[in-house]
């Protein structure tokens, strides 16, 4: 029994796309490895060359000899022979040996497997049918062959974890002419396979896509579901839930995830789900389907409630039930029946809901994130898939991993890792513990086999994370080897590389990179995407920062008109002031405000009377662009401007507003530190004398009166000043403990060292050393400036 369980687990792993197996049968393990290698060579745009085919045939011969050398029971031997027969037929087909392919495929087709292997047998049958059909002379004959024999092989709706089976169905559907006409398919194929007919009908002709939503088809599918649920009864204690309903639910999961748009689902689906719940006992598939159905219906404001029931909350409750039932199943079987569906549901809930949706004692958003990570680790270890742990994930160039998952599994796993990365991307602890690198390192080998754009985006985020950790040398290598050698026009990668080089004492390399890329972007200006135009603006600002560092502020101020001319050339005249893209929302007003704030900061570098007036003008322009959803971005810089104008009280008001909006606003905290240290420097002796004095009420009133005469007086007395210093200490400690920007900002550590020195604490030297370290590693601009 143990051996049979190990064999089934190996087959389960293979259907998921695994490449390493431990079934206790060496011949089977090696046969599955040959099958994996064949899939690796035939996936995507890859082809099998005669040389590769020769190597694979040699491996097949070795496995066949091994299976003959050691006695195996007939069911296991048949399984191995059928796997190898399919592999040999596919190799012959791929290298143009069609007669040999026909013979080997027929031999494999004649092998009847034990019912124990029915799930894997269906996959092998579909694979065999596809290549057998492809041996026909033209597309019509291929389509006819598939129509005639598909339902001789396809006997049930595969679960999401039977990913290779789904991949075969996609390939078959691509060659079926007119397969997405549901009304015709119902006439051709029998009623007892109706859920399968529905599944075939929603697969579009292009691999990886689904058909568009059709209201007529939706009504047809709903009608079938209603008729089905009306006929069945609640199962007895000795019975399982209705098989046909469970099959229909598997189809609906695919249908509602990929076909039905938000607000398009009929409210009758809600009634169907309620009836299905009343006719089943703790059905994992019903709870899974209910999550998507209720979320889709509940996305419409008018349908957000049905009979007083809040559907958004109802969807979450079904997710809770889905997880509860799945965990019960795991306790019974020591494994999940459909682990990919679990990952899909966790992804869906984490991306569609927030912490505001938490339900006491039932649903916790943060806990769901932890459970997603635990489930991923379990998945990798259970199916012997290489997992990048923290130590091994530091350099993906040193530790490359090659994976070849079926599209659905690859998409689910990559989304899972990116979901974890995106949620934790602003976490300092996740950055310092290398968790962020681990998330991305596990996503990179998956994305490599999927979409080139996803691969480049993931590698870029990996390099950006390295740069944030100040591991700029490795970041530069990753950018060069994995992005720029393949895509020399990836401007954001060049921008990040320039910022990495700018951490070094010699800024010339960074300056040369920026100038070369800006010249290339100028030559290709007409072809730039919306995102690349934003990249152009911020790279121009990086160039000006480098000029300021290398040649001085006056030379930089002379080039400011070029920045505004560039903005006008790129964006003015366009109708859209806001552009929504796959990477987020790009707001032109926010970018223009950034330009004005940068100009303001430049004029403040040389605070003459004229320059301060120019700075005020730039600040007024920036403030005029303020919007509610990014309120107060100008406040820290206006506070610094007020400090230069010796209007300390107004500066403090701006600081308070900024910290109230965001208590981790590093610029505001540093302005606060500047105010406090400036006051202490001016009146150090008075502060020492008055520190322990208590001020009576009359004294406070007198102090208030004096303050009205002197608007720049910030503190009533030394006690008030001490309280402000204590508050600053809390803000600084919080910044270096929780904020990525705060931890790597030298001025934050310098301010902390000043406080530690003032109170003679042992952390003075540590803070000072951190300040020096991060000053030496400071880029010319924030690394995030290239992340557009």
Curated annotation (Swiss-Prot):
Keywords: Cell membrane, Endocytosis, Membrane. It is a peripheral membrane protein. SUPFAM superfamilies: TPR-like (SSF48452). InterPro entries: Endocytosis_PI4K-reg_protein, TPR-like_helical_dom_sf. It comes from the Eukaryota. One of its GO terms (cellular component) is plasma membrane. One of its GO terms (biological process) is protein targeting to vacuole. Its main location: cytoplasm. Gene3D superfamilies: Tetratricopeptide repeat domain. It is found in: Cytoplasmic granule; Cell membrane. Involved in endocytosis. PANTHER family: TETRATRICOPEPTIDE REPEAT DOMAIN 7, ISOFORM A (PTHR23083:SF464), TETRATRICOPEPTIDE REPEAT PROTEIN, TPR (PTHR23083). Belongs to the YPP1 family. This is Cargo-transport protein YPP1. The lineage of its organism: Eukaryota, Fungi, Dikarya, Ascomycota, Saccharomycotina. The gene is YPP1.
């Amino acid at each position: 029994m143990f051996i049979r369980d190990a064999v089934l687990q190996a087959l389960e792993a293979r259907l998921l796309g695994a490449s390493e197996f431990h079934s206790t049968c060496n011949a089977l393990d090696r046969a599955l490895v040959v099958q994996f290698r064949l899939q690796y060579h035939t996936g995507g745009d890859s082809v099998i060359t005669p040389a590769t085919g020769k190597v694979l045939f040699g491996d097949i011969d070795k496995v066949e000899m091994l299976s003959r050398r050691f006695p195996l029971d007939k069911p296991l031997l048949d399984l191995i022979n059928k796997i190898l027969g399919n592999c040999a037929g596919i190799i012959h087909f791929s290298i143009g040996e069609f007669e040999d392919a026909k013979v080997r495929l027929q031999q494999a087709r004649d092998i009847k497997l034990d019912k124990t292997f029915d799930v894997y047998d269906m996959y092998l049958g579909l694979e065999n049918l596809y290549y057998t059909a492809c041996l026909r002379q033209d597309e019509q004959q291929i389509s006819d062959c598939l129509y005639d024999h598909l339902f001789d092989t396809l006997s049930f709706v595969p679960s999401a974890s039977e990913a290779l089976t789904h991949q075969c169905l996609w390939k078959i559907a691509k060659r079926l002419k007119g397969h997405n006409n549901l009304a015709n398919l119902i006439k051709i194929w029998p009623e007892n396979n109706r859920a399968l007919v529905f599944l075939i009908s929603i697969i579009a002709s292009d691999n990886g896509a689904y058909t568009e939503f059709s209201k007529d088809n939706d009504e047809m599918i709903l009608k079938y579901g209603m008729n089905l649920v009306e006929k069945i009864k609640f199962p007895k204690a000795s019975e399982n839930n209705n098989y046909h309903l469970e099959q229909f639910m598997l189809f609906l999961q695919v249908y509602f995830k990929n076909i039905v748009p938000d607000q398009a689902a009929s409210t009758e689906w809600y009634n169907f789900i309620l009836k299905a719940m009343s006719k089943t006992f703790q059905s994992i598939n019903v709870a899974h389907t209910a999550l998507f159905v209720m979320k889709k219906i509940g996305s419409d404001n008018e349908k957000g409630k049905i009979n007083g029931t809040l559907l958004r909350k109802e969807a979450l409750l079904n997710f809770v039930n889905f997880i509860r039932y799945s965990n019960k199943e795991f306790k019974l079987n020591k494994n999940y029946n459909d682990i990919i569906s679990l990952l899909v549901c966790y992804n869906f809930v984490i991306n569609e809901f927030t912490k505001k949706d938490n339900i006491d004692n039932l649903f916790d958003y943060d806990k769901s994130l932890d459970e997603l990570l635990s489930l991923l680790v379990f998945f990798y270890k259970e199916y012997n898939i290489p997992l990048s742990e923290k130590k091994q994930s530091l350099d993906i160039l040193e530790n490359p991993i090659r994976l070849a998952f079926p599209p659905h599994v690859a998409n689910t796993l990559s989304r899972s890792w990116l979901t974890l990365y995106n949620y934790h991307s602003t976490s300092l602890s996740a950055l310092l513990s290398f968790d962020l690198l681990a998330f991305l390192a596990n996503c990179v080998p998956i994305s490599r086999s999927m979409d080139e754009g996803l691969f480049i985006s993931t590698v870029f985020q990996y390099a950006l994370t390295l740069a944030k950790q100040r591991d700029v040398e490795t970041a530069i290598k990753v950018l060069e080897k994995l992005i720029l050698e393949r895509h020399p026009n990836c401007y954001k990668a060049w921008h990040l590389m320039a910022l990495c080089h700018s951490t070094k004492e010699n800024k010339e390399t960074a300056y040369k990179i920026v100038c070369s890329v800006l010249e290339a972007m100028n030559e290709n200006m007409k072809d730039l995407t919306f995102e690349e135009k934003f990249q152009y603006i911020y790279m121009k600002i990086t160039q000006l920062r480098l000029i300021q560092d290398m040649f001085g502020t006056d030379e930089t101020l002379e080039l400011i008109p070029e920045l505004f001319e560039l903005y006008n050339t790129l964006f003015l005249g366009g109708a859209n002031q806001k552009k929504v893209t796959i990477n987020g929302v790009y707001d032109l007003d926010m970018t223009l405000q950034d330009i004005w704030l940068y100009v303001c900061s430049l004029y403040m570098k040389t605070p003459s009377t004229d320059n301060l007036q120019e700075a005020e003008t730039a600040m007024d322009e920036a403030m005029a662009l303020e919007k509610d959803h990014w309120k107060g971005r100008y406040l820290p810089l206006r506070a610094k401007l007020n400090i230069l104008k010796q209007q300390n009280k107004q500066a403090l008001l701006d600081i308070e507003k900024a910290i109230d909006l965001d208590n981790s606003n590093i610029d505001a905290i540093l302005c606060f530190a500047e105010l406090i240290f400036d006051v202490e420097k001016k009146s150090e002796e008075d502060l020492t004398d008055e520190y322990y004095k208590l001020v009576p009420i009359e004294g406070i009133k007198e102090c208030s009166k004096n303050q009205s005469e002197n608007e720049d007086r910030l503190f009533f007395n030394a006690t008030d000043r001490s309280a402000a210093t204590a508050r600053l200490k809390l803000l600084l400690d919080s910044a270096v403990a929780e904020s990525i920007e705060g931890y790597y900002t030298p001025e934050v550590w310098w301010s902390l060292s000043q406080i530690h020195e003032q109170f003679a604490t042992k952390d003075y030297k540590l803070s000072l050393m951190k300040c020096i370290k991060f000053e030496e590693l400071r880029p010319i601009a924030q690394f995030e400036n290239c992340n557009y």
